[in-house]
């Protein structure tokens, strides 16, 4: 009963928010220049609502019909980009209904031209009118991509809320069986069928809120890596990867955008390395060894079943185990990839790379990592045309795609590797990242090791590190997938969907904790505090040396702290650690706050905005751990504030203004990852301003994880690891207690 009451309240609130908010006429014939934050956000949310079909809002239709881009060239800061776009538009673009693919050169070239028109609009009014025009004419996926990138980089969009990508385009984040069940409920108008609902895990309230249990489906397992699906397929983790690309698109090489003055290359490099470090910790929870780098001349043992259904109705292709990677069909691609990788590696060894135009890129100093990372990950072209940036990571992903079978230029069926929203789901992408990060490791190994003076902080001593008990658990989350459904004529006329669809998933989380650090100082001084979490033992149970695990240290926090003379007790809550986002706000929740006359919602969204652009999911701060406790180590180093170690073209002030500060990038010019980014001379390493501490990470017993919840999930089909990797008993109804008894016997 409590479940129905809770869901009914949610449905009522959602319906009220949508009808009250989206029904507001925000697009007008008068200039939309002086709109407040609330109205701007309403504009964005209406534009991105049900993107797969023409808009249901009359104000958007009217603007799209009356506005003429070609006759409004004077309203754009760069007339040439408008002319180039219109020439392309008249020649024909990716049709509506096709899937926009991030690694397809032709489609990406079109998307870049769309972005430039949006970006160079002189003011918010022109920006919105252009977006309305494009919303009704170009491919929905391409529009979302270009519009999102424009919102990330336009100054008049600073602080504005963007719906989470998994709410805009649920197809790339939800298993296909969930989408199919939602369509079934939509077509039958949720006709009562208790037996089928119970079998499929579907709950329907009187207010037509449909909740579909994600886990009530057959799990296809092709390799041992599928046990990690709860982590790799986490919607917030994949959003993090997508937004990382949106902050620094590989094709954005022009200085006009301003991001070339940021530490974009180093940030992208370190983000990839940190993802690998976080994956290593998660694998240790399952006693799995490290990810192996991709090898092109060997059969690929790891297959993958994406379970993703595209809006066109096609399924993302399955990659079988033991696939032969290098074939006669992709020989040219492999030769190009090998040549580019060899050129970069030779450049590291010789200390320079000469580009086709004769300019030389130096790769000798620590700060040169910026240019190296841009060469490898995008942002610095080898050839002159930025639409054809030779992007090594993209070349590697395309090697494993099925592009050679897509004979038509527009009917391209992507693999999971082809999309920034799905690539983390595929175990092979982590192998690609491992190979790419090995390039940076080679560069770092060529640099001098840090000296004792670079490690130490005279007069400062870290005396003790203590933490609360570190406990993880699996919780439930309802994700709104209503935008995956098509609206019928009546719903279009009523400006709202008759039903709200939610996918109920189970995801990794942890209890909040605090880290307490006791520091003695003989002076008052500003300091940079860095906190890392890393392994103590490898997958075989062997004690790891500092050099063995330095690339597996996951950076939890980095912040400025003013030390005073004497004892300093630094207390950091996991909720306040820099670079993590607690939760992506749901669009329905934001709509409710937008309707508040007090403006509390605006303050909430504004405070949350910076983290939404950069934040790693706070839920995934800790690895799963084990019921008996997984032993790891926490490391703290207190360092002086150092400056003057960056390329002269970089501007940390601009990074702060754009909320692009990740880790210690805006508070110190030391390389990201310091002190673990280079091989360590153990004779110089251990100084008084650093300390290791053993910690245990406990996984909460399955029977305890839902004791305080109002939603009764005791009849859910479970399995040994309490996650998403189901066994052959998946159709047998068992209680939590039954499963835990089975689990203990199996252990």
From Swiss-Prot:
Q: Could you list this entry's UniProt keywords, alphabetically sorted.
A: Glycoprotein, Secreted, Signal, Storage protein
| Any Pfam family hit | Hemocyanin_M
* GO molecular function ontology, one term from the record: nutrient reservoir activity
Residue positions the entry lists as glycosylated: 494, 706
- Database matches in Gene3D superfamilies: Di-copper center containing domain from catechol oxidase, Hemocyanin, C-terminal domain, Hemocyanin, N-terminal domain
Recorded GO CC terms: extracellular region
Where does this protein reside within or beyond the cell? Secreted, Extracellular space
Q: In which tissues is it expressed?
A: Fat body.
What PROSITE patterns does the annotation carry?
HEMOCYANIN_1, HEMOCYANIN_2
Signal peptide (from-to): 1-15
* SUPFAM superfamilies with a match to the protein in the record: Di-copper centre-containing domain, E set domains, Hemocyanin, N-terminal domain
Respond yes or no to whether keyword Glycoprotein is given for this record. Answer: yes
- Which InterPro entries does the UniProt record give? Di-copper_centre_dom_sf, Hemocyanin/hexamerin, Hemocyanin/hexamerin_mid_dom, Hemocyanin_C, Hemocyanin_C_sf, Hemocyanin_N, Hemocyanin_N_sf, Ig_E-set
Superkingdom of the source species: Eukaryota
The reply on keyword Glycoprotein is yes
**Function comment:** Larval storage protein (LSP) which may serve as a store of amino acids for synthesis of adult proteins.
The UniProt similarity line reads: Belongs to the hemocyanin family.
Q: What is the recorded name of this protein?
A: Sex-specific storage-protein 1
- Please name the source species: Bombyx mori (Silk moth)
Upper lineage = Eukaryota, Metazoa, Ecdysozoa, Arthropoda, Hexapoda
- The protein's gene is named SP1
